Amino acid sequence: MAKKQPREQKIKISPTKGRPMLNWVGKKPLDYVKGYPAVLMEVFDPLKTNLRYDVPKYENLEKNWQNLLFYGDNKDVLATLLEQGFRGKIDLIYIDPPFNVGIDYVRKVQLRGLKTSKIEGEGYSAIEQIMYFNNFLEDTYLQFMYERLQLLKELLNERGSIFVRMDYRFGHPIKLLLDEIFGKENFRNEIVVNRTQEFFKSSRGLKKLMVDTDSLFFYTKSNDYIFHEVSVKREKEIWWEITLPGEHK
């Protein structure tokens, strides 16, 4: 007897704030998503404790969610989390999405007895596997991000925060999307993040100023949010001498 397939459920999505609003060809807010289990789920052991973990069942996912690694389209995974009771339960979200740099990322797969050859009509060899797409049409990319940011908002706790990393290519339009979805009043900071030294080396010889930073956009779900002050202890104390009001030495 064939195994019964899980029934898809329609999960309603809340409307966006709506102002300010960015428009593009094919823009369509998500009204609902179809909830069904993500393709594969594993337990991640970041501390390398070597303890044995059993992959939790979907019906127990809400009570046993630590250190889970999902495989599959992130939109399907977010829909799975919504279906399994995580709406409004997530305190902190960080995403580092594709920047739409115009290049798809691939990895080489070693296959015994197979010579390297190009697949007809494709730009990849037979032993290269696409890791993720990073080459979208502009309108397609904005819709891609729009849908996923809407789902992330559904998962975020009312006192929760989200951090979205972007670079100069689409940082400005993504900021407008975040304003539309989370509300401009819930924007907290644009945090500047330095890039690696490897990027500096690849930028030599360009006839323009080097771009050596990314932006991390910090938004909250509401005005009543959790925030822990960030501070670093100085190795040596520094005394500021004030000579005139507003002037420092």
Which residues fall in each region the model found?
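Core catalytic lobe of class I
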Residues: M1-K249
